[in-house]
Amino acid sequence: SFSGSALINDDGAFTGQAQRPRLRNIDARHIFKRNPIGNGSAAVIRREVFDAIAFRPDYEAHREWYFDETFRQSEDIECWLRIALSTDWEFEGVPGLLTNYRISAGGLSSATDRQLAAWERMVGKLFSLAPEFFASEAPVARAYQLRYLSRRAISDLDAPRARELSHAWVKTSLKPVREEPLKSATTLAAAYTLSLLGPRFLRQIMSLAARKGATQ
């Protein structure tokens, strides 16, 4: 099980944004495209689930692994997908924003190039587990991942990277536009606002959103 999360900054202040994920009827496609679990802090997992996905690398002599510890990023979605694709366990969320999730400038979430590389490595690693699934779903999931990274670049006020990633996800697949038109449109609008009007203008908008979120 898992819950939504309110986003906070380095100082612990609410940003006005939140992860409000899908809570029910979740399958591997939803996890691959949108990762409704959101972050590892939001999840509560039964021991039996970990027992079902345990593995031991050839060079590990002492203990079982559950997450792939060779990953520095994307280790959470790699684990969730192994659960979804190789076991009968179901994912279901609990209503409400029950955790806070810190977005750190210059942290892992901000390193969009490394995060994209880790995501692609995750896809390559798991492909043999369900080849037909990944062949069918990877293009759309990649577009969603690029859109997410575009939003991270926007939050970091990195106009060139935000614009580059926005072009990339639209070119990869238009399904995010059809499936989530509002979020897709606001992402594109923010990327081009940042590029055309500069970080100061967008920062003012983000500050207003943070103040509004703090009062809700």
Predicted regions mapped to residue ranges:
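C-terminal subregions of glycosyltransferases and related glycan-biosynthesis enzymes
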Residues: 85, 96-216
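Short secondary-structure boundary/hinge segments and terminal tails
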Residues: 9-11, 25, 102, 187
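Phosphate/oxyanion-binding loops and surfaces in catalytic or ligand/nucleic-acid-binding neighborhoods
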Residues: 8, 43, 86, 90, ...
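Conserved donor NDP-sugar-binding/catalytic core segment of glycosyltransferases
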Residues: 1-17
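Conserved nucleotide-sugar donor-binding catalytic segment
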Residues: 21-114
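Short, solvent-exposed polar/charged micro-motifs at secondary-structure junctions
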Residues: 9-13, 75, 146-147
